[in-house]
Swiss-Prot record:
The lineage of its organism: Bacteria, Bacillati, Bacillota, Bacilli, Bacillales. HAMAP family: Mannitol_dehydrog (MF_00196). The gene is mtlD. One of its GO terms (cellular component) is cytosol. GO terms for molecular function: mannitol-1-phosphate 5-dehydrogenase activity. NAD(+) binds at residues 3-14. This is Mannitol-1-phosphate 5-dehydrogenase. It comes from Bacillus subtilis (strain 168). One of its GO terms (biological process) is mannitol catabolic process. Its EC number is 1.1.1.17.
Length: 373
């Protein structure tokens, strides 16, 4: 039972590949990094270490790999035989692997069902990949593929820190993980994936992750940067920053509980668990890395402004947004662009243009007040 996984990077090996291996699949990685492909085929296994006290580890194997750029015939053969295809290549790379997957689907000569799951840090990753794949197929081919191939969306969550290992195949991951899959998107029988959660509606889980993990991480980083702190761990250990982060997550939590019916006590435990992840001393994450791409993260539907617009009194979120607007790290192109926009249009103009917060909205005034404090 073959699982073909696109992306032999840290998340592919340390998260998705490991879970598929534990679920009984023969995992084959597809990647264009020839060094990684050769190493996986030479060693046929790799080590996954948990970033926690004691640093327990396990061997994942046997596994194999192919170069999806040069071994296209082998790729198409595997696609014909695979029971499951997954990806962890990054949102921007999905469109690059779509032509090869389209050709593999075009050549499939089996009536067996196949499901393709994009495990990316984006909303609707599988739907996006499907759209990209279908752009390389004729209408008749699309109809044929749609009869046997499913594209269930999923939400994934696991922190994979910067790696410092002599063994290039070894990967450290945090103990916590979450892989939630929309069961309604499958063709045929739902596959066995140990550790995954299958749900009828993915939206509550996507928003819970985005408005808790991503929001909390961003507020920690932006406020921490303003305080001159270097790492997420240092930032969340600062009492005032911790208060702001916790308050922001209580604000988003109120919206999530009311909108999706999460139990209040369970969601409070979820918030506690998420803040505990930021406190993990075995994960070193610079605030400048977590805070990068402020233009995207200040978007109207993203982790800061998105929930703030849905809440009556988003004071802590407004503080996080104000800190994000002040993010001036010269090593990040978006931060440089953001500061240039502020210089040109002022905070009010940027709130309207970048954040979609118009001058008549109460949130606009709340954020400006925070910026003037």
């Amino acid at each position: 039972m073959i699982a073909l996984h696109f992306g032999a990077g840290n998340i592919g090996r340390g998260f998705i590949g490991a879970l598929l291996h534990h679920s009984g699949y023969d995992v084959v990685f597809a990647d264009v990094n020839e060094t990684m492909v050769s190493l996986l085929n030479e060693k046929k296994e790799y080590t996954v270490e948990l970033a926690e006290e004691g640093r327990s580890s396990e061997i994942i194997g046997p596994v194999s790999a192919i170069n999806s750029g040069s071994q296209t015939e082998e790729l198409y053969r595997l696609m014909n035989e695979a029971a499951l295809i997954t990806t962890a290549v990054g949102p921007n790379v999905l469109k690059l692997i779509a032509p090869s997957i389209a050709e593999g689907l075009r050549r499939r000569n089996t009536a067996n069902t196949l499901n393709i799951i994009a495990c990316e840090n984006m909303i609707g990753g599988s739907s996006f990949l499907k759209k990209e794949i279908y752009s390389h197929l004729t209408e008749a081919e699309q109809k044929s593929v749609s009869e046997t191939v499913g594209f269930p969306n999923s939400a994934v969550d696991r922190i994979v820190p910067i790696q410092h290992h002599e063994d290039p195949l070894k990967v450290s991951v945090e103990p916590f993980f979450e892989w939630v899959i929309d069961e309604s998107g499958f063709k045929g029988k739902t596959p066995v994936i140990n550790g995954a959660l299958f749900v009828d509606d993915l939206t509550p889980y996507i928003e819970r992750k985005l408005f808790t993990v991503n929001t909390g991480h961003a507020v920690t980083a932006y406020v921490g940067y303003q305080r001159g702190l270097k790492t997420v761990k240092e930032a969340i250990d600062h009492p005032e920053i911790r208060r702001v982060v916790h308050s922001a997550l209580l604000e988003t939590g109120d919206y999530l509980v009311k909108s999706y019916g999460f139990k209040q006590t369970e969601h409070e435990q979820y918030i506690k668990k998420i803040i505990g992840r930021f406190e993990n001393p075995f994960i070193s994450d610079d605030v400048t890395r977590v805070a990068r791409s402020p233009l995207r993260k200040l978007g109207e539907n993203d982790r800061l402004v998105g929930p703030a617009k849905k809440i009556k009194e988003p004071n802590a979120l407004a503080e996080g947004i104000a800190a994000a607007l002040r993010f001036d790290f010269t090593g990040d192109p978006e931060a440089v662009e953001l500061q240039a926009l502020i210089e040109e249009k002022g905070y009010s103009g940027v709130l309207q243009e970048v954040c979609g917060i118009q001058s008549h909205e109460p949130l606009h005034a709340i954020i400006l007040k925070k910026l003037n404090q």
